[in-house]
């Protein structure tokens, strides 16, 4: 049976193998062959030995060469481990000096390359090898217990694989030089099982000149894996230093935890001493506290106190001069009238805007109001409290003030003689207004609305503005409160109605002059909306005030009768129906602008 493979190349053994032939009976040795000689393994070996080729692997050990060694199986994933490395004398096989009985079966079916490099002795040496192999084979055949212990087909004469590669194969038809050459290329096998040597291995010691002479004297003890110096030192200094390092690391970790617990625990008593030095309060720090007494004293009160001192000193000077004859010391220069700007903070603004009076304000009257009362002016005393000079901030009563755009304007700093209330009214919603008096007056008006008709006849000259002459609630009776509230309301209605009538008269003049038609339409739209808004609010007030405004009401009636024909379009054609104009009016016009102080809508 001759099989020629169809493949022409394989990468497993580095080269073409076209001349490879499987073993067959034609390649068997001359002479009659028994069952043993007809077995597959030695026929393969004979065919490989008798057909030398240049196409073979450099190593014969399948495990060391990182290839599967039988039937040309290879994964081609790893390289040869010992490729290109020269073999040292210590790596020579320990059983390579034996005879043919020590030879083992080649572990690959690939043909052998480098045939010239193999040490081939003469024909006499080959004949001696064959004789020794035959003698060893006959001895095995004659011993029954050896056959019982080691089966020829399973143990001693099996094809080597990764499992049973350590078994030795002895036969009489192989070439000694080839087997020795293959053993020389695979030194790792001699290290693994040196105890498989036979008795006749010492006869053929000088097989090749390249083999060392001391290879036969190597002991047959099983060697262990080679370890580095660091691993050998594991049980010595290296292990000692490793344990020292582990113990030191654990100790440092415990110390670190103890220090952190000691420093950052708050349950135990703190070792740090508390500083008992008194510091400024959080209120003073938040409000920008400055240890300056003049900040807590109004300049007006200081001036008043200095005037008192100067008057008393001027009265005493003539007597003292007459007695002593010396002039008194000149008075010190008065403080500057310029008031420093207040340092503002949220808390200071709230305190300054709050309206508080002294506890004894009902029994004390300031100097200015006393002088005015003595002069004969029937002006009720104001609610404003002027603070006297003091050295402590806590004893000064908070002055009534007003807040405009985050600026505190104390009402005591205003000039009461000229009534100079110059406050820019940018946004009336920010004003702080006390509405308690108005609420009380509204309640009194609701209770005594039936008998309050006679109080509405008071004249316009007796009305005083609430901002100019505020009166405390304690000095007024309920009837007086109701009458004053009605007077203020009637004054408001008369002023508003008069302004509206004057505007209508002016519009009438523009109409009679004959202007632009677009201007005429605009005037008509304004008049229509104005009439609808004002008629419902002012009918009752106009009836009550008809006596004082007879001429104005007649003019208003003439204007309304003459313009009634032009304003037949109604609210649908008014200018206020336009969306942009409505948005502008909604954002700019505020109802509280046309109400007296103290009323809210």
Curated annotation (Swiss-Prot):
Disulfide pairings: none
Domain of life: Eukaryota
Biased composition (Basic residues): 271-285
GO cellular component terms, A-Z: cellular bud neck
Subcellular locations according to the entry: Bud neck
Comp. bias (Basic and acidic residues): 458-467
Residue spans of biased composition, Low complexity class: 89-101, 443-457
Region span, Disordered: 1-38, 77-101, 174-214, 271-386, 443-478
UniProt biased composition (Polar residues): 1-11, 198-207, 289-304, 357-376
Family stated for the protein in its record: Belongs to the AIM44 family.
Protein name from the UniProt record: Altered inheritance of mitochondria protein 44
């Amino acid at each position: 049976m001759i099989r020629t493979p169809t493949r022409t190349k394989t990468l497993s053994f580095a080269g073409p193998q076209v001349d490879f032939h499987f073993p067959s009976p034609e390649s068997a040795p001359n002479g009659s062959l028994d069952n043993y000689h007809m077995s597959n393994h030695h026929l393969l070996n004979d065919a490989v030995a008798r057909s030398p080729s240049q196409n073979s692997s450099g190593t014969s050990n399948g495990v060391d060469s990182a290839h599967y060694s039988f039937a040309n199986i290879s994964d081609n994933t790893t390289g040869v481990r010992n490729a290109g490395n020269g073999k040292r004398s210590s790596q020579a096989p320990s059983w390579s000096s034996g005879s043919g009985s020590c030879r083992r079966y080649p572990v690959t079916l690939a043909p052998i390359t480098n045939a010239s490099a193999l040490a081939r002795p003469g024909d006499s040496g080959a004949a001696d090898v064959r004789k020794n192999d035959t003698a060893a084979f006959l001895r095995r055949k004659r011993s029954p217990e050896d056959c019982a212990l080691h089966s020829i087909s399973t143990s001693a004469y099996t094809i080597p694989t990764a499992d049973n590669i350590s078994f030795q194969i002895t036969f009489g038809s192989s070439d000694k030089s080839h087997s020795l050459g293959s053993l020389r290329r695979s030194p790792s096998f001699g290290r693994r099982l040196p105890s498989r040597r036979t008795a006749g291995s010492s006869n053929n010691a000088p097989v090749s000149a390249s083999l060392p002479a001391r290879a036969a004297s190597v002991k047959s003890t099983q060697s262990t894996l080679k370890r580095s110096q660091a691993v050998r030192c594991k049980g010595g200094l290296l292990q000692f230093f490793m344990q020292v390092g582990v113990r030191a690391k654990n100790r440092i970790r415990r110390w670190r935890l103890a220090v952190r617990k000691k420093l950052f625990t708050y349950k135990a008593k703190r070792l740090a001493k508390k500083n008992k030095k008194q510091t400024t309060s959080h209120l003073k720090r938040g409000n920008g506290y400055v240890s300056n007494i003049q900040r807590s004293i109004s300049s007006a009160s200081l001036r008043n106190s200095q005037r008192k001192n100067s008057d008393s000193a001027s009265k005493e000077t003539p007597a003292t001069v007459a007695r002593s004859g010396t002039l008194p010391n000149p008075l010190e220069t008065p403080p500057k009238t310029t008031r420093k700007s207040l340092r503002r903070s949220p808390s200071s603004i709230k305190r300054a805007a709050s309206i508080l009076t002294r506890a004894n304000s009902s029994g004390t009257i300031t100097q200015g109001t006393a002088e005015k009362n003595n002069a004969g002016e029937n002006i009720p005393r104001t609610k404003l409290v002027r603070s006297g000079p003091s050295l402590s901030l806590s004893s000064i009563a908070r002055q009534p003030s007003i807040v405009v755009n985050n600026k505190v304007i104390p009402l005591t700093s205003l000039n009461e003689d000229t009534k100079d209330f110059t406050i820019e009214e940018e946004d009336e919603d920010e004003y702080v207004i006390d509405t308690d008096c108005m609420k009380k007056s509204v309640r009194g008006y609701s209770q005594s609305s039936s008998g309050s008709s006679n109080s509405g006849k008071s004249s316009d000259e007796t009305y005083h503005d609430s901002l100019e002459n505020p009166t405390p609630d304690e000095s007024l009776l309920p009837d007086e409160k109701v009458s004053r509230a009605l007077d203020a309301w009637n004054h408001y209605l008369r002023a508003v109605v008069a302004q509206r009538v004057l505007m209508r008269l002016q519009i009438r003049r523009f109409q009679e002059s004959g202007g632009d038609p677009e201007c005429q339409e605009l005037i008509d739209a304004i008049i229509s909306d104005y009439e609808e808004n004002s008629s419902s609010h002012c009918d009752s007030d106009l009836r009550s005030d008809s006596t004082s405004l007879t001429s104005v009401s007649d003019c208003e009636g003439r204007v309304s009768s003459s313009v009634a024909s032009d304003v037949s379009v109604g609210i649908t054609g008014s200018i206020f129906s336009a969306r942009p104009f409505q948005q502008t009016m909604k954002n700019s016009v505020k109802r509280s602008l046309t109400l007296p102080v103290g009323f809210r809508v």
